[in-house]
From Swiss-Prot:
Spans within the Extracellular topological domain: 25-438
Lineage, highest ranks first: Eukaryota, Metazoa, Chordata, Craniata, Vertebrata
Signal peptide positions on this chain: 1-24
Protein's name in the database: Plexin domain-containing protein 2
Transmembrane segments: 439-459
Length: 513
């Protein structure tokens, strides 16, 4: 019994090794450009595969020196700012991204740098929360609920994820590769709060703004550089402020070997598609559609960066206001989701599935007017009109996925969406596909059971060579079959079976990920 149990354990370990090898192969590509973070205090994770595809779309930057009458963060946090900075004002360098944000960088001599820094030490101590786990771990992230709606790239957030690596993750799909996209990064680097007793990660929410501060944190791979103190402030009007108090070395000198080094913003949309071979399992692919990269040479002690949100299509709630908008986007209105969009936001999959890429912004509003006129034309034909409208809606739903998409990016995304594109008219095909999936699973299970049975029989014969079952199989091995004997004597060359003089030791080398 002892030998048999050891054999079973060996079989289990063999399958575990194969599973680990497959997992390593699946995640190897992600590890090339990202690092893994552990998530604490979140909802149970859904067992789904997540991959990150960092597609970048070109955007222009404009640099100029300007004066500003921007509202100060002091309106949200009065009398709680860093003291001792120089009051002399200098020119403000404005980097204008003509898409989603305008960034303004203030040097250590700018008075605005003092105004934008929130002195968290002067706040009510009972309202300042020091996160115990983040302050004592490495590569850890935790969910934080907001008391207000925070607009990020036009989307309203009520929950964020604060990471020890100097950034905030803003995505709804929580995965381990948080540094890839969907982040707010005042200074993303390989910080480890656990290496020093003075290192903390704390935050404060006063109902209109959230301040997250990384206080006296050190780099894990270069502790001798000194401690960093910086913060990110998220304001309910969409403004984002990065404040820097202690930056002991130029940011360009921070190593990115073990962790990405980034300063800026990023957002992405998620495409969910099914896997044909495995039912009830979905795969999420994350596409980055925009990124703001700030100049790292401008990040110094007592400097600050303010990012002002620009108008987006998502803020328009009607067809007329959408198509007549004069902003930096080509806004279009889609009837089915009742949404205004440029086509690239977090609702991208819904936009493509509903055929919104085919709708013209010049004719959509006219269609809405015609539909309204039909509904008020007569009351006697109410039932007939309702039936026609339902039929039209069903037809539209059946053709949600466009047959001819205008751009290469749309085509690539559509290929992912086809896995989800089963319409209401294809119920029979769905049942057939479900039957095929069931048969495939049963076949795989039978094959696995046969392989396990063969392995167990071989192990049993090895440990019990004199048993009746072993002798029975040995006497009926293929070399004893009549056909094999006839072939051996038919003039065809054959190899003779010989017993080895001495046994050779074999070994298996297993590599870990």
């Amino acid at each position: 019994m002892g030998a048999r149990s050891e054999s079973l354990v060996g079989v289990v370990l063999l399958f575990q090794l194969l599973a680990d090898r497959l997992w390593c192969a699946a995640t190897a590509s992600d590890s090339l450009y990202d690092v893994s973070y552990s998530i604490t205090a979140i909802k149970p994770r859904v067992d789904e595969m997540v991959s990150v595809d960092t597609h970048m779309y070109s955007h222009r930057w404009k640099r100029q020196s300007v004066d500003t009458n921007r509202p100060s963060v002091g309106q949200d946090f009065p009398d709680m700012f860093l003291e001792g900075t120089n009051e002399n004002g200098t020119e403000i360098e404005e980097d204008t991204d003509h898409k989603y944000y305008t960034s303004r960088t203030y040097g250590p001599l700018d008075s605005a740098s003092r105004d934008l820094w929130v002195n968290i030490d002067q706040m009510e101590k009972e309202k300042v929360k020091i996160h115990g786990i983040l302050s004592n771990t490495h590569r850890q992230a935790a969910r934080v609920n907001l008391s207000f709606d925070f607009p990020f790239y036009g989307h309203f957030l009520r929950e964020i994820t604060v990471a020890t690596g100097g950034f905030i993750y803003t995505g709804e799909v929580v995965h381990r590769m948080l540094t890839a996209t969907q982040y707010i990064a005042p200074l993303m680097a390989n910080f480890d709060p656990s290496v020093s007793r003075n290192s903390t990660v704390r935050y404060f929410d006063n109902g209109t703004a959230l301040v997250v501060q990384w206080d006296h944190v050190h780099l894990r791979d270069n502790y001798s550089l000194g401690s960093f103190t910086f913060q990110a402030t998220l304001i309910n009007d969409g403004r984002i402020v990065f404040g820097y108090k202690d930056i002991p070395v130029p940011v360009m000198q921070i190593s990115s070997t073990n962790h990405p080094v980034k300063v800026g913003l990023s957002d992405a949309f998620v495409v969910v598609h099914k896997i044909q071979q495995i039912p009830n399992v979905r795969r999420r692919t994350i596409f980055e559609y925009h990124r703001v990269e700030l100049e790292m040479t401008k990040i110094t002690s007592f400097s600050a960066v303010e990012m002002l949100p620009l108008a987006t299509c998502l803020q328009f709630n009607s067809c007329s206001s959408c198509v007549s908008s004069m902003i930096g986007f080509n806004c279009s209105w889609c009837n089915i989701p009742q949404r205004c969009s440029s086509g690239f936001d977090r609702h991208r999959q819904d936009w493509v599935e509903n055929g919104c890429t085919e709708e013209s912004k010049d004719t959509v509003c006219d269609d809405l007017l015609q539909t309204t006129g039909i509904s008020h034309h007569t009351t006697t034909g109410l039932h007939a009109t309702t039936s026609i409208y339902a039929f039209t809606t069903t037809t539209r739903m059946a053709s949600h996925f466009p047959s001819n998409l205008p751009t290469e990016d749309d085509t690539k995304i559509a290929l992912h969406l086809k896995d989800n594109g089963a319409s209401t008219d294809n119920s029979a095909a769905e049942m057939k596909t479900g039957t095929l999936h069931t048969g495939l699973i049963i076949g795989i299970l039978i094959l696995v059971l046969l392989i396990i049975t063969a392995i167990l029989v071989a192990v049993y014969m090895y440990h019990h060579p004199t048993s009746s079952a072993s002798l029975f199989l040995i006497e009926r091995r293929p070399s004893r079959w009549p056909a094999m004997k006839f072939r051996r004597g038919s003039g065809h060359p054959a190899y003779a079976e010989v017993e080895p003089i001495g046994e050779k030791e074999g070994f298996i080398v297993s590599e870990q990920c």
